[in-house]
């Protein structure tokens, strides 16, 4: 068979996203490709194509930013790295005509954050990869799952566009704002017995990565009980940063205003042991805050990549929730908790490990998971479903 000429039309037609070769039982060599729409360097004004892989080249790594390399005389840009066989994560490309974003040879953490902040609005998904969505920071990303990546319950089901949720507008007197809320019910059971799950960053799970077909599939498979799901929009990054980190007003408004509104539409159980609060990053912090302060209402906490460093972003001091637990101001006694963090988000992993150590006396009711991934919704989506399965497993015994 004749080898295809690099950069030819037939060569590009043979590419369907990243390619990998096994190096050994644990590692693969992975190559990413991008086609310059302007052609070769003779015609193109593109100076750099930054590659932003969550948990590998992102700002959480505090490492030198990586640019793809052009193959001279072609429209081909490529970049190669090594990844674990069980790795899963999202990535994007950032083509730019500028060559001065990361001018320092070894930029520090603040320079990295600022540089990526400038670049990410220009990010694009991999045109060769059919799996893409809008990431949490608003830019397009694509998915990469290595051959031995852990199974993600329910995400193997076909997308079913006919499955939709009821969308309402919640006008909060306490918070002085309005937002969208999605209400979704599954299964067939006495309405008052249905468990309740509150999902933070609801707009992401409703629109960017819709959970409806996944929840429906897992309920049909009897891995999840029939339930009511409430997805709360964060409004925007400013409201999110104010309302989610340890904000009593937000959770009082949820309990006093939103939940009665939801209950009139889709009745659910008031039992704390049937109620899950789930969130990621600031949302993970917020979920545990709700459980610690209102355990009589929120008995199950699903925290993924929780920002337990808050409010000390540098990570040099303990976060406020850990301080309160150590001082005995709050107690996790009686809660069931899923605590998950990625080994490729160092500061968040350290904060979660410290929290888990503090919670260790009640370890029988804690599910602690370390994921080979970063600060990444592609990882969170599997942990979200597995967490619901684990937290609600006792309900199946109640019914038997």
Model region roles, listed by residue range:
Residues 2, 23-25, 29-86, 96-153:
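Aromatic-rich carbohydrate-binding modules that target alpha-glucans
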Residues 379-389:
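Post-His helix in hydrolase/transferase enzymes
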Residues 169, 198-266:
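Cap/lid segment of the alpha/beta-hydrolase catalytic domain
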Residues 87-95, 183, 194, 250, ...:
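Short beta-strand segments enriched for Tyr within beta-sheet-rich domains
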Residues 182-185, 192-203:
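Short beta-strand element of the alpha/beta-hydrolase
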Residues 202, 234, 302-311, 343:
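Active-site nucleophile loop of the alpha/beta-hydrolase fold
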Residues 309-379:
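The feature captures the conserved acid-bearing segment of alpha/beta-hydrolase catalytic domains
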Residues 210, 270-324, 330-331:
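Primarily recognizes the serine-hydrolase "nucleophile elbow" in alpha/beta-hydrolase
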């Amino acid at each position: 068979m004749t080898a295809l000429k690099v950069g030819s039309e037939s060569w590009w037609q043979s590419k369907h996203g990243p390619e990998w070769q096994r190096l050994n039982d644990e590692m693969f060599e992975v190559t990413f490709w991008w086609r310059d729409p302007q052609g070769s360097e003779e015609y193109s004004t593109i100076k750099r194509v930054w590659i932003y892989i969550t948990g590998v080249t992102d700002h959480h790594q505090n490492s030198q930013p990586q640019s793809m390399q052009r193959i001279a005389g072609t429209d081909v840009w490529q970049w190669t790295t090594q990844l674990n066989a069980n790795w899963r994560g999202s990535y994007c490309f950032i083509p730019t005509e500028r060559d001065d974003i990361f001018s320092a040879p070894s930029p520090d953490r603040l320079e990295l954050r600022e540089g990526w902040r400038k670049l990410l609005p220009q990010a694009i998904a991999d045109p060769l990869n059919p799996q893409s969505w809008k990431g949490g920071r608003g830019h397009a990303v694509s998915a990469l799952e290595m051959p031995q990546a852990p199974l993600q319950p329910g995400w193997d089901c076909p997308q079913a566009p006919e499955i939709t949720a009821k969308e309402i507008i919640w006008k909060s007197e306490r918070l002085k704002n309005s937002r969208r809320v999605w209400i979704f019910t599954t299964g067939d059971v006495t309405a008052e017995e249905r468990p309740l799950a509150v999902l933070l960053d609801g707009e992401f799970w409703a629109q960017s990565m819709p959970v409806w077909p996944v929840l429906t599939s897992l309920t049909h498979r009897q891995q999840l009980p029939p339930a009511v799901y409430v997805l709360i929009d964060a409004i925007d990054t400013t409201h999110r940063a104010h309302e989610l980190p340890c904000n009593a007003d937000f959770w009082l408004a949820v309990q006093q205003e939103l939940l009665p509104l939801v209950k009139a539409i889709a009745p659910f159980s008031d039992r704390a042991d049937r109620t899950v609060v789930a969130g990621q990053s600031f949302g993970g912090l917020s979920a545990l805050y709700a459980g610690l302060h209102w355990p009589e209402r929120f008995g199950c906490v699903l925290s993924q990549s929780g920002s337990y460093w808050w409010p000390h972003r540098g990570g040099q001091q303990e976060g406020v929730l850990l301080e309160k637990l150590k001082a005995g101001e709050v107690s996790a006694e009686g809660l069931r908790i899923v605590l998950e963090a990625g080994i490729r988000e160092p500061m968040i992993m350290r904060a979660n490990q410290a929290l888990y150590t503090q919670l260790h006396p009640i370890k029988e009711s804690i599910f602690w998971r370390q994921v080979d991934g970063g600060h990444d919704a592609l990882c969170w989506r599997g942990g979200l479903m597995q967490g619901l399965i684990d937290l609600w497993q006792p309900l199946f015994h109640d019914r038997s």
